A protein has these predicted regions:
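Short, surface-exposed alpha-helical recognition segments that flank or form part
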Residues: 15, 19-23, 88, 92-95
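Acidic catalytic patch
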Residues: 108-122
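Short, contiguous alpha-helical
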Residues: 1-9, 15, 21-32, 43-83, ...
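Helix-adjacent hinge/juxtasegments
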Residues: 68-108
Length: 171
């Protein structure tokens, strides 16, 4: 409509680094959202799968993975401590996941604007974000399946909320 009236429409240029950070932010927030919405009965329940981990252990793994690369890349920036899968509570895990999200956005965001290097990681900053979005989605799928197998399926509203990336990215 604006063009029909002879008014030029101006759009901000697309910045891939910003788009990657926004996508990661949403994905990481979904991790935290899922933990906050989990039925309490599934947190420490033994896995029904052979050689399976508890949901607490899966969430601990989600959080702990990648922390060392962040510490090496930006030693001066605060990176959350690793979680202990044996004693972590859902509230502690949710807080830690939020802290990790903020650390990744700060550290990897800076790397994306610089040389793209994540110290010790075999790929660049964009690869780091992509790798961990896929990694985390895989484990979210395991958590959802395991909750169902334990007789406590994730609520429909929570499942819908996991796909509301625009909303999650703003939280």
């Amino acid at each position: 409509m604006a063009q029909a009236l002879g008014v030029a429409r101006t759009r901000r240029p697309f910045v891939a680094a910003d788009a990657l950070l926004k996508a990661y932010s949403a994905s990481a927030r979904v991790n935290q959202y899922l933990v906050q919405e989990l039925p309490a009965a599934v947190w420490r329940a033994p896995s029904p799968l052979p050689k399976g981990r508890t949901i607490a252990a899966l969430v601990t793994h989600l959080h702990n993975c990648g922390l060392r690369y962040l510490e090496r890349t930006a030693p001066g920036i605060s990176v959350p401590a690793e979680l202990d899968r044996v004693c972590v509570t859902p509230a502690q895990a949710a807080r830690a996941l939020g802290a990790k999200r903020r650390a990744v956005l700060a550290i990897v965001g800076t790397a994306l604007k610089g040389d793209g290097r994540i110290v010790g990681f075999p790929y660049d900053a964009a690869g780091y974000l992509s790798y961990y979005m896929v990694h985390d989605a895989h484990h979210r799928g395991q958590i959802v399946l395991q909750a169902r197998l334990l007789g406590h399926p994730i609520r429909r509203q929570t499942m819908i909320g996991m796909w509301q990336w625009s909303k999650r990215a703003k939280e």
